[in-house]
């Protein structure tokens, strides 16, 4: 994989709802229409039962070689813009001031949403 491809940030979650089995991470470019709604990839991170707090580790961009406990739900859509296939695509606007975010969802074993939060990752 391309070590220069960037990676997801480490995310610290607290007060995870009881019954949460997975955390769904939907990475989005809020500015560029073609990469909204998970355009930078959707990842699932599996938790042990009744986890209250977790540090979600980073995931390398432009690869499907994911760390333990991660699953690619939807690969990034950057291939239509010349990027290498993979589960996640790091911010890549080239400094145009795009805003990037991640929708964080706690889901139970039946994929019912228990809680959600949107975290703005920054502008690049």
Cite the ranges covered by each PLM segment.
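N-terminus-centered regions that define maturation/targeting leaders and the start
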Residues: 1-124
